[in-house]
């Protein structure tokens, strides 16, 4: 997994080396090809408080007061970008967990953090540890919609398996679909930013405190039969082609998922080759449809075990494919994984009818990000 130094401006990513020619792998892969198709915004902005409509004409005294409030790590946040369309925010990312901060009773403070993928919506609220339940969460979600004038979301993504019962129950009572997923990238980045600029400055901060609810990394299971392809290959695309592929993603693909590269601050040369995995099958459309419901997170080449690991949801890992370990195949797997790390974790999964085709039935742009420090 790549280690990224994130800031609110950009993540710097070095150039990606060329990947050696891929080899064939098994179950039920029989052949291999290099996928060579050439056809295959917002910058991160975190705010510390909501701005009143009269902010354009505030006095110097008010400016000083606002700066003090913005600098206060104990303050809460309720923000909606005034230029955004509130009705268009249909999916939220949510974390409800303890923080490395003690209250006056010496107990860990809990915090609700909510945003959307574009960070147009940003909300934080602290809670004592004796009110943590689905009712508290449900009421907090409703309060967000009332305070900011946004509708209830259709989906809420969350990444902590330990909170699944509470979050799912709260969402069910509000007719919201709870989606367990590590594709909460905006939330991941925001939590990292809050740790660096808010939590560590809080008067109750406990240095060295470990997360109460850590992320799961379970042993990989066998892949369900309906997710098998017939062939696969390590592949690579120029960064320019990746950007083109996701430029009008919703129009091109029924199946798949994109990333906001501007939000992530990815900076690489347009000719840099981004590693990926191409899977071909005569059942491309059904396979892509099945994959579409899995919240695909990442793919890992495990050269020590001679297999590829597919991570989906929040705590599910599959042995996606296996291969015969030889010096050549080991070098190829290690080169692919190294290239992925060098690109800041950026990689992709393409599902096709044929490995020689220039078209994809499904396309998932993926990235490895370290888990948040809280």
From Swiss-Prot:
Nuclear genome-encoded A/U-rich RNA-binding protein involved in the biogenesis of photosystem I (PSI) and II (PSII). Required for the light-controlled accumulation of PSI and PSII during early plant development. Does not seem to be required for the translation of mRNAs of the PSI subunits. The keyword RNA-binding applies. GO terms for biological process: chloroplast organization; de-etiolation; photosystem I assembly; translation. It comes from Arabidopsis thaliana (Mouse-ear cress). The keyword Repeat does not apply. Disruption phenotype: Albino phenotype and seedling growth arrest at 2 to 4 leaves. Residues 58-84 are annotated as: Disordered. This is Protein TAB2 homolog, chloroplastic. Its main location: plastid. Keywords: Chloroplast, Plastid, RNA-binding, Transit peptide. One of its GO terms (molecular function) is RNA binding. Residues 1-64 form a transit peptide. It is found in: Plastid, Chloroplast. Residues 64-74 have a biased composition (Acidic residues). Induction: Induced by salt stress. One of its GO terms (cellular component) is chloroplast.
């Amino acid at each position: 997994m790549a280690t990224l130094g994130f800031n609110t401006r950009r993540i710097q990513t070095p150039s990606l080396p060329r990947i050696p020619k891929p080899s064939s792998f098994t179950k039920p892969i029989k052949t291999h090809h290099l996928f060579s198709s050439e056809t295959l915004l917002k910058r991160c902005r975190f705010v510390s408080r909501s701005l009143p409509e009269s902010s354009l004409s505030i006095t110097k005294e008010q400016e000083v007061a606002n700066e003090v409030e913005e600098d206060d790590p104990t303050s809460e946040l309720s923000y909606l970008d005034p230029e955004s369309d509130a009705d268009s925010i249909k999916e939220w990312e949510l974390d409800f967990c303890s923080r490395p901060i003690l209250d006056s009773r010496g107990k860990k403070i809990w915090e609700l953090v909510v945003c959307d993928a574009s960070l147009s919506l940003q909300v934080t609220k602290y809670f004592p540890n004796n009110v943590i339940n689905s009712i508290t969460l449900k009421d907090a979600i409703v309060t967000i919609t009332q305070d900011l004038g946004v509708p209830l979301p259709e989906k809420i993504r969350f990444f902590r398996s330990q909170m699944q019962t509470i979050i799912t129950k709260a969402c069910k009572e509000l007719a919201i679909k709870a989606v367990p997923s590590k594709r909460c990238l905006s939330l991941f980045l925001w939590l990292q930013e809050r740790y660096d600029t808010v939590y560590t400055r809080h008067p109750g901060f406990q240095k060295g405190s470990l997360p109460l609810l850590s992320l799961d990394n379970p042993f990989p299971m066998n892949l369900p039969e309906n997710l098998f392809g017939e062939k696969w290959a390590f592949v690579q695309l120029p960064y320019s082609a990746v950007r083109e592929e996701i430029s009008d993603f919703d129009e091109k693909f029924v199946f798949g998922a994109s990333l906001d590269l501007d939000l992530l601050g990815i900076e690489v040369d347009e000719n840099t080759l981004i590693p990926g995995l191409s899977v071909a099958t005569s059942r491309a459309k059904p396979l892509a449809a099945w994959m579409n419901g899995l919240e695909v997170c990442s793919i890992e080449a495990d050269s020590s075990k001679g297999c590829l690991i597919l991570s989906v949801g929040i705590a599910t890992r599959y042995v996606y494919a296996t291969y015969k370990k030889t010096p050549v195949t080991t070098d190829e797997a290690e080169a692919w994984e190294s290239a992925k790390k060098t690109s800041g974790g950026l990689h992709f999964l393409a599902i096709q009818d044929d490995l020689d085709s220039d078209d994809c039935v499904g396309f998932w742009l993926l990235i490895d990000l370290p888990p948040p420090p809280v």
